[in-house]
Amino acid sequence: MFRTRFKNEIVAEFLPPARPRKQDRVILLCDGMPGIPRKQPLSDFLSKKGYWVFYPRYRGAWESSGKFLERSPHEDILDVLDELPKGVKELAFGRKFSLSPAEVFVIGGSFGGAAAILCSLDPRVHRVVANCPVVDWSILRASEKKETSNKSYAAYIREAFGNGYRLSDANWRKLYTGKFYNPAARVAEMDPAKIMMFHAKDDPFVPWRSVDRFARKSGARLKLLKTGGHLRTEYIMQRYWPEIRQFFER
């Protein structure tokens, strides 16, 4: 995979489509959190399906500059989208790539599912797929207790992931407000035709009822699985690709 940097801050891996198409179709991948970046196999899978694939790191996470959650992570994804019509220069040898996005799709899982859903509000985004997404941060305190006994989740992240996330207590607390980076706060603005979600009833971290409730309020499509736990986005994309491809092509 190639590497580039957007807005002088956001590092992204990317792949051009394995086979050229008449129109450039772009997929932006939104990572979960916390976790090590590992969507390279998914990027390769999607590239072979004919898409440009961009896999950015949020500001303040991993290779990117900045402070994590200083801004809503979905804005980082949209900042990447802003830059694409200008072309992309890979960092190792300076090779330049030109593209003119005809259709843009956003895929995210868990924490990144919220980013994907919020990106659907941008008119440039054609469709989004959100896998086991966090749709309402009211679940946060209960979810934290399942991951750590540390009373400060941000402190746990700093200790466990080092500089992988430059996360302050103050920025993490913004999620508790219900207004910051929260799809539920903007559900009335959603276009249900642009959103497809996947979730398992036995997900231990994101309660399925919260996602089902969001789907009912927004009208978004939800494929609810009986089992699967906290579903891996790569698995979902490969297992349900024919269905997802039809959704993209509507």
Feature names for model-found ranges:
Residues 68-98:
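Alpha/beta-hydrolase active-site loop
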Residues 1-22:
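N-terminal cap/lid segment of alpha/beta-hydrolase-fold proteins
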Residues 118, 122-169:
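Hydrolase active-site cap/lid region
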Residues 204-210:
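Conserved alpha/beta-hydrolase "acid-adjacent" motif
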Residues 46-65:
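Conserved alpha/beta-hydrolase
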Residues 228-241:
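Catalytic histidine-centered segment of alpha/beta-hydrolase-like enzymes
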Residues 23-32:
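Short beta-strand element of the alpha/beta-hydrolase
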